[in-house]
């Protein structure tokens, strides 16, 4: 997984190692089969495979699974720009579901729009991928908080 250039500068020189370690400690992402596809300062891409246990009653991937994927991508994009010794928590998000969740796998892309010292505004996109073709199925705006509190360190 190659990182690409980013306009953002991380505040922690070990941001990538810290991000990968934090991701590995997330049981929900393991349950959903989510993997890190790309990690750059201020931008993260995660992938989730189609699986029967994440479907809703009509055979589409449940909106909750898509939301978890994109929220996590946004959170890790924000975390990549946070100082060492801090953690990230979502304080608000809005998800627009534009198309049913149909595809072989789903990509969640989180991007930091405004990297504040205590609050970061992010944009998330969810793509359904089938045979290499991508379709935008959902958009998220999310606000992430930089948490400097014992027990909440990523």
Report each predicted region and the residues it spans.
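A generic structural signal for short beta-strands and their flanking turns/coil linkers
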Residues: 30-32, 42-44, 87-93, 104-106, ...
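Residue-level recognition of specific faces of alpha-helices
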Residues: 66, 87-89, 94-97, 118, ...
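Hot-dog-fold acyl-thioester-processing enzymes
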Residues: 24, 49-73
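HotDog/MaoC-like acyl-thioester-processing domains
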Residues: 2-3, 8-13, 100-154
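Non-catalytic linker/capping segments at the edges of enzyme domains
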Residues: 1-47
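Hydrophobic residues in beta-strands and at strand termini
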Residues: 48-50, 97, 146
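Hydrophobic beta-strand-centered segment that forms part of the acyl-chain substrate-binding groove
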Residues: 61, 76-107, 112
């Amino acid at each position: 997984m190659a990182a690409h250039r980013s306009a953002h500068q991380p505040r922690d020189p070990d941001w990538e190692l810290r991000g990968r370690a934090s991701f590995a400690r997330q049981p929900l992402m393991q349950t959903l089969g989510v993997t890190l596809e790309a990690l750059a300062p201020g931008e993260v891409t995660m992938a989730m495979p189609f699986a029967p246990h994440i479907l809703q009653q009509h055979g589409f991937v449940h909106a909750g699974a898509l939301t978890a994927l994109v929220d996590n991508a946004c959170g890790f994009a924000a975390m990549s720009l946070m100082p060492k010794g801090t953690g990230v928590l979502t304080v608000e998000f809005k998800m627009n579901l534009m198309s049913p969740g149909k595809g072989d796998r789903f990509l969640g892309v989180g991007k930091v729009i405004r990297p504040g010292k205590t609050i970061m505004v992010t944009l998330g996109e969810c793509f359904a991928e089938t045979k290499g073709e991508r379709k935008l199925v959902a958009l998220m705006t999310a606000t992430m908080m930089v948490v400097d509190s014992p027990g909440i360190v990523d």
